[in-house]
Amino acid sequence: LNDAVLEEWMISVEDQLEVVRRMRIAMPEMSFAVESNDHYHREIAYVPKWDIGMDNVGVEKIEDAIKRPALKILGRCSNHEFTSDEMVAVAHREVQDLVTVTHSTSRDSLIEISALNISKGTSLAMMAQRLGLTADDCVSFGDNPNDFSMLEWASRSYAMSDGHPEAPTFAKGVAEPCEADGVAKIIEQLLDLPA
């Protein structure tokens, strides 16, 4: 394997615009960014964190930058008016017919929006099938809602004990926190390696 993109599931221009329209009504505090492999645009009100330097100018309204399909729409409440869980609940209610909504951190007011029915779980299942593998051949670790579908799919899955409180309900087991080498300890057990 290399870093070649094997497949992309894009959100159409029309669906991006409709998602933003609905979410502006449901949660006016939210600002937006859109990204793909070769482009990233954000609203001026969207305060970047991990994506600092990708768009240093921004646009007033993201609708002005939505000109082609995107891999992801990011929604942020830059003043932390809502938690990520609260934002996902509202977005799920408003746009679940168009896209998949999740988040990857409880410590930031940020949601991630991808194409309908696309998640880590569906992507892992597709990749495994291409390689002739099944869920029984796979191990997954996760800590936040963006990992839940993957934890649910893999036959051996572990929620990080310091992750989102709902993660263990989707996993088959629980791993110690990363800081305590939780992933390494599980891998050693699975490979029957001495500790």
Regions found by a protein language model. Give the residues of each.
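Short glycine-enriched loop/turn motifs at secondary-structure junctions
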Residues: 1-4, 67-69, 106-107, 152, ...
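Flexible, active-site-adjacent loop/turn segments at secondary-structure boundaries
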Residues: 4, 9, 109-111, 191
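Short, flexible loop segments at the rims of nucleotide/cofactor-binding pockets, characterized by
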Residues: 9-11, 52, 116-117, 152
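Mg2+-dependent phosphoryl-transfer enzymes with acidic/Ser/Thr/Gly-rich catalytic loops
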Residues: 112-195
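Catalytic cores of large soluble enzymes that bind and process phosphate-bearing ligands
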Residues: 11, 79, 175
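Glycine/small-residue-rich loop that forms an oxyanion/phosphate-binding "nest" at active or ligand-binding sites
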Residues: 1-17, 23
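Conserved acidic, metal-coordinating active-site core of Asp-based
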Residues: 22, 26-141, 145
